[in-house]
Amino acid sequence: MECKLVNLSNNDVGTTQLNPLIFSVEQKLSILHDIVRWQLAKRRAGTHKVKGISDVSGTTAKPYSQKRTGRARQGSLRSPQFRGGGVIFGPIVRSHAYSLNKKVRKFGLKVALSLKYLNNQVIILNNLNINVKKTSEMCKYIQNFKFSSFLIVGDYEDSLLRAARNLHYVNLIKPIGLNVFDILNHECIMLTSDALRYLEGRLL
């Protein structure tokens, strides 16, 4: 599939070929749902923790006699029914991550890229070699494209990252870090020609 090649000023500089095995695959949205859930589960810190009956500070003595008081029998003041007692089956520190097949993850990336291409939300850039040092300069380049948010994929200089860092609707990412959640979370995906070649090697 032929696609036009532009620079960050949105001027045509040529054409490039997009592989239909990446940008024109069957749309299976359930795959995207599975992968986003997997990504969000992996990023959870899992540091939630409450004290159980064995963690609560307090005496181990029986509160009062088993019989003759007329009250319900109790064996510990650290039981959950008492104020300051432990929590039963409460959250503990754990990992929420689970495994997902590599084939599924790879196919999901193709589905996400195909979805963006189908909606005309993929732009192929010749490179990111621009001399910008200020956010205002980066903003002028971005305003050449009529989208609400941008994910720029390619090898970039630190100066470009610093210039774009303060724009909440612009994110830069290396080709190796491209993922389904970020693709779906941005309206427009900008790929450099080098990033495109890398993705072909990664996904085919």
UniProtKB/Swiss-Prot annotation:
GO (cellular component) term, any one: ribosome
Region: Disordered, residue numbers: 53-77
Segments passing through the bilayer: none
A Pfam family the protein falls into: Ribosomal_L4
GO molecular function annotations of the record: rRNA binding; structural constituent of ribosome
Keyword tags: Ribonucleoprotein, Ribosomal protein, RNA-binding, rRNA-binding
BP terms from Gene Ontology: translation
Keyword RNA-binding: yes
Origin: domain of life: Bacteria
Compositionally biased spans, kind Polar residues: 56-67
Family (UniProt): Belongs to the universal ribosomal protein uL4 family.
PANTHER family: 50S RIBOSOMAL PROTEIN L4, LARGE RIBOSOMAL SUBUNIT PROTEIN UL4M
Record's function text: One of the primary rRNA binding proteins, this protein initially binds near the 5'-end of the 23S rRNA. It is important during the early stages of 50S assembly. It makes multiple contacts with different domains of the 23S rRNA in the assembled 50S subunit and ribosome. Forms part of the polypeptide exit tunnel.
Subunit structure of this chain's protein: Part of the 50S ribosomal subunit.
Name listed for the protein in its UniProt record: Large ribosomal subunit protein uL4
